[in-house]
């Protein structure tokens, strides 16, 4: 079921739709900033590092995207995504297909005194880590809202407790869904 209510900046939970052999994780956020400001935050390397990852971007159709996340796991490993831009309509649409995290899509539309960001990540249906993915994207979109307000993430000391709270909530929703109606292929988790 698509997400329809408006939440300013952060806290809006993501949803999952499963169809055609894929999971589509979707978030919708109202951001009290212009489309141009949000577009810059999702496309310019010096802004991406403040909320998502170190980035190299050839902002052209077919262009290469490389994201290197700055938060590390317990062993110090950092995720790196290599992707190709598959859709580009500045300043409203950016989509790239990557080797990890699937296809990422950022859609912007004007809304009174700001814009709506619809973010989605399309993953193979075999992906069992949906609560992990949802918690990660939820946290990064919260960081985006904060970065647009001038607060960059302190990556060496990033707030894992926030991610953990999101993960526990999504994992609980996933378990409840699995215990509920198994016949539906479409739902919130």
Question: What positions do the PLM features span?
Answer:
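Short beta-edge strand/loop motif at the mouth of beta-sheet-based domains
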Residues: 26-27, 33, 37, 44-82, ...
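Charge-dense, helix-prone N-terminal extensions
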Residues: 3-4, 10-11, 63, 80, ...
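Hydrophobic pocket/interface hotspot
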Residues: 38, 48, 65-67, 85, ...
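Short, highly charged C-terminal tails/helix-capping segments
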Residues: 147-189
